[in-house]
């Protein structure tokens, strides 16, 4: 160690070299910061609040990487000075003793009784024998003077620093690619959604038509002999996920069941189910892109699996593969069980088969648990990719972490297979089936309506806290007192009560609920400017109006033909005399 050449300090380094390094680092950092800012501005412009929040989580993750980098830089000197006995340091190595001896310059393998005493001394020669890296700190090994080994060397800390950064970057990129590919497959749903607004769809889905449940398109797909046995049900659903995992009949049937369970009668032709799914998926993407403490703990456990002799390449890559197959099968089973529940209520159905959503179809009664499993799969697969990239960069293609070609082939092939399954099979299936829970998600409202609701809710809670009455505070307090057909949820109300004794808050709560509101088309902001100029005049004339205006559902207009064709639900007419936001 006496012949070891110490590295230069900044006192011995040219100032122009230091300036060039600082300039390059600052330039790269500024470009990345501006790029992230531009992406965030584009998300705001396109009203992609969920994706903007996901971007904020990515920025928080990068900030966490900065803190880890700072701690590693500051603490590597202190950690490398922690000395442990050689017999403890000789356990759980990625390389075998013979491979370490060959790789680090020892021609013959030491005897078994001398192996523990000599093995760690070989590692002390790494920096002088391998020219591809320089030591991260200057000086010498203080632990060698004591006959011990450093807990983690300074150069080992530097390599760990690089791995954590690669892991975070690979995870974010992997999630973005998976989300983009999944949305690409879901584009075909737009055509199915538009079909529900056509006259042909109303003819083919006559609500007065009686059929056997097995004779419907949904019944022929799910109600068969194999669905009677749990074993055959899981076997068929396992293979079904690989071939047309989401079909048109499944989409339309689950869409109809969601609308009937959560929305107002007659909303079938107006509600855009595909946009609701898209908003929900964007909301879930915020969770997927984040690396929470549980996921970080799993990453630490994965690092322990690289010990020589565990052969982690034979089982670790298959964990995400098996989990994603089980999740895909479970989602298919849920769709089939929804169909079986229809048959349990009777062999004959009227109109479109009506599925009834419920949390009991999901594991532990929690639809969000499936999202956690998908998150775990994405991270595990990203971990495999990041570790392969990092180990190849640091030690070459053939190293102690993947010694054989079989290891490399398994890691790459399984990783690509999981990527395809998660993007094109499981993610679209998850986005559709998880809407079959007992509760609908807040994303059922568009961005502006959700903002108005939150603002009103905050104001109402504030008034209650101060003991005020909420009579003067409603979501319409800055809106027209009598909203028009296009800006109010009135036209979705059915069988409105004829009593005027209802309070302002009660009438609003019932009319503004998702079941009784035009949540997807009502835009309070678009009506605000008009309301400012006409609000006072309209209030003075409101009590003197004698004519009645009738509001009817106009979303589906069928042409006259031989015989009257009824839509799925009838909307009763409502008079302004019978409904009012005032007492």
Swiss-Prot record:
Residues 1-15, 83-161, 306-314, 390-411 are extracellular. One of its GO terms (biological process) is defense response to fungus. Residues 447-468 are annotated as: Calmodulin-binding. Pfam families: Mlo (PF03094). The chain crosses the membrane at residues 16-36, 62-82, 162-182, 285-305, 315-335, 369-389, 412-432. Its main location: membrane. Residues 37-61, 183-284, 336-368, 433-583 are cytoplasmic. Residues 541-551 have a biased composition (Basic and acidic residues). It comes from the Eukaryota. It is found in: Membrane. Keywords: Calmodulin-binding, Membrane, Pathogenesis-related protein, Plant defense, Transmembrane, Transmembrane helix. GO terms for molecular function: calmodulin binding. The keyword Signal does not apply. Disulfide bonds: none annotated. Residues 461-583 are annotated as: Disordered. GO terms for cellular component: plasma membrane. It is a multi-pass membrane protein. Residues 470-484 have a biased composition (Low complexity). Belongs to the MLO family. May be involved in modulation of pathogen defense and leaf cell death. Activity seems to be regulated by Ca(2+)-dependent calmodulin binding and seems not to require heterotrimeric G proteins. The C-terminus contains a calmodulin-binding domain, which binds calmodulin in a calcium-dependent fashion. This is MLO-like protein 6. The gene is MLO6.
């Amino acid at each position: 160690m006496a012949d070891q050449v110490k590295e230069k300090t900044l006192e011995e380094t040219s100032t122009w070299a230091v300036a060039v390094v600082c300039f390059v680092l600052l330039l790269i950092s500024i470009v990345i910061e501006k790029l992230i800012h531009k992406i965030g501005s584009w998300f705001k412009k396109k009203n992609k609040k969920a994706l903007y929040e996901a971007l904020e989580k990515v920025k928080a993750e990068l900030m966490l990487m900065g803190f880890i980098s700072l701690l590693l830089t500051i603490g590597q000197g202190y950690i490398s000075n922690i000395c442990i006995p050689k017999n403890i340091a000789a356990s759980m190595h990625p390389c075998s003793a013979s491979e370490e001896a060959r790789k680090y310059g020892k021609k013959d393998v030491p005897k078994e009784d001398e192996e523990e005493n000599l093995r760690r001394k070989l590692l002390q020669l790494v920096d002088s024998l391998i020219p591809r890296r320089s030591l991260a700190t200057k000086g010498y090994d203080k632990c060698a003077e004591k006959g011990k080994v450093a807990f983690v060397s300074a150069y080992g800390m530097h390599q760990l620093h690089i791995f954590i950064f690669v892991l975070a970057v690979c995870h974010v990129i992997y999630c973005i690619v998976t989300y983009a590919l999944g949305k690409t497959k879901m584009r075909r749903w737009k055509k199915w959604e538009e079909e529900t607004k056509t006259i042909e769809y109303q003819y083919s889905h006559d609500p007065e038509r009686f059929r056997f449940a097995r004779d419907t398109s949904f019944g022929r797909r799910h109600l068969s002999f194999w669905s009677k046995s749990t074993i055959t049900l899981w076997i068929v659903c396992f293979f079904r996920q690989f071939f047309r995992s989401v079909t048109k009949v499944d989409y339309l049937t689950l869409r109809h069941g969601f609308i009937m369970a959560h929305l107002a009668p007659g909303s079938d032709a107006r509600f855009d189910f595909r946009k609701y799914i898209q908003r929900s998926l964007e909301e879930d993407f915020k969770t997927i892109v984040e690396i929470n403490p549980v996921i970080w703990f799993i990453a630490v456990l994965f690092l322990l699996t690289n010990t020589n002799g565990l052969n982690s390449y034979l089982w670790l890559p298959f964990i995400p593969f098996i989990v994603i197959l089980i999740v895909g099968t479970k989602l298919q089973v849920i769709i089939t069980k929804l169909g079986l529940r229809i048959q349990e209520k009777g062999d004959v159905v009227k109109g479109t088969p009506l599925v009834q959503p419920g949390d009991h179809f999901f594991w532990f009664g929690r639809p969000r648990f499936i999202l956690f499993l998908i998150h775990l799969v994405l991270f595990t697969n990203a971990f495999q990719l990041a570790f392969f990239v990092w180990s190849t960069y640091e030690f070459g293609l053939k190293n102690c972490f993947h010694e054989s070609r079989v290891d490399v082939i398994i890691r790459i092939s399984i990783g690509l297979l999981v990527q395809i399954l998660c993007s094109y099979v499981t993610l679209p299936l998850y986005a559709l089936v998880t809407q079959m829970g007992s509760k609908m998600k807040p994303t059922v409202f568009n961005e502006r309506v959700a903002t108005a609701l939150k603002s009103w809710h905050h104001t109402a809670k504030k008034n209650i806290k101060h003991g005020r009455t909420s009579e003067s505070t409603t979501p319409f307090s800055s809106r027209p007192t009598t909203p028009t057909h296009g800006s109010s949820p009135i036209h979705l109300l059915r069988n409105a009560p004829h009593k005027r004794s209802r309070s302002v808050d009660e009438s609003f709560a019932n009319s503004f609920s998702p079941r009784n509101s035009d949540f997807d088309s009502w835009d309070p902001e678009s009506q605000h400017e008009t309301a400012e100029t006409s609000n006072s005049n309209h209030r003075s004339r409101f009590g003197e109006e004698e004519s009645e205006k009738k509001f009817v559902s106009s979303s589906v207009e069928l042409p006259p033909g031989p015989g009257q064709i009824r839509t799925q639900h009838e909307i009763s007419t409502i008079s302004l005399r019978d409904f009012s936001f005032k007492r």
